[in-house]
């Protein structure tokens, strides 16, 4: 390897994941690929292009600057900016020809004052973050958008809080609130695009699909329920790799790493990889993860430091300097997923890939064929 660590992203996998998700949808339902947070750590522009090639019709982000990046990169598809926007951010979003999300009449006025734009009105049905909880207020905002100069009432939306918990009935409570508000609104404004479903809801209940689904995590081959992606025919697109930089003998009683969190009980060898929490490998994985070397799981031992992790590779050593190491991905018959790491860290798979830091370059390929 010419770099310490590398995240390899299979563009073809993203395309196939989008096609797989489209199989869940009626032909009249559009798929919006969510590429916020630099495409969940995969790279926003390559992910956006792959998603569109796979059949997505829309893209969604949270920040206005993310929309501007997509436009600068040559993306011409409809873009929805889902986050709250300051006056300056609203300028950027509208300049990028992005649709924006609003929930009070002053926002409609702000869009109109800037020459207009397309607004999606958000009803908070239970997420408790953005949007108005009051359906009457949401309707007034929609009516204001429909008549304001230069403004187009483009959509009506909500967001589910517990779609990824299949045993939690709150999804259907939220759905009922959204439907009760949406029905009368559509009687007056039949052209609006209604949308509510994230990846989990898309896979869980077709009643949530409406006109458009906003799929994020699943297009990257990450399972929205935190389970094995392959069981849902999702294909993880990202592989995180490093290499063995050093191998040394460790005698019984000798320690490895800060704080002596690993003390050898038997003669062994430790391999050091030049990747650490400065690259996005969480320190909480100390003595709590495996890495693939020569197709075999090797336990991570010792404290994860900023620039290195260390593995017990046995005696005699089953690793040599230069061997490839896989932290996320496949090698031989073994596989380590973002879901596995998330389980070890008591978090979600999104955080694993979003947490890869800028020191890790991204490289793109199509089923093994490198892309320039």
Describe these PLM feature segments.
Residues 167-269:
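Anionic-ligand-binding alpha/beta catalytic cores of soluble enzymes and soluble regulatory domains
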Residues 34, 120-122, 155, 214, ...:
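Conserved beta-strand segments that form the floor/walls of ligand-binding pockets within enzyme
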Residues 81, 153, 244, 300-301:
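A structural signal for short, hydrophobic beta-strand segments that form beta-sheets
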Residues 249-372:
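C-terminal accessory subdomain/extension
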Residues 25, 72, 92-93, 114, ...:
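Solvent-exposed alpha-helices and their adjacent loops that cap or buttress functional pockets
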Residues 1-3:
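Gly-rich Lys/Arg/Thr-decorated short loops/hinges at beta-loop-alpha junctions or inter-strand turns
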Residues 5-8, 13-16, 27-196, 209:
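Active-site-proximal beta-alpha core segment in soluble small-molecule metabolic enzymes
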Residues 126, 161, 200, 218, ...:
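Catalytic metal-binding/acid-base residues of hydrolase active sites
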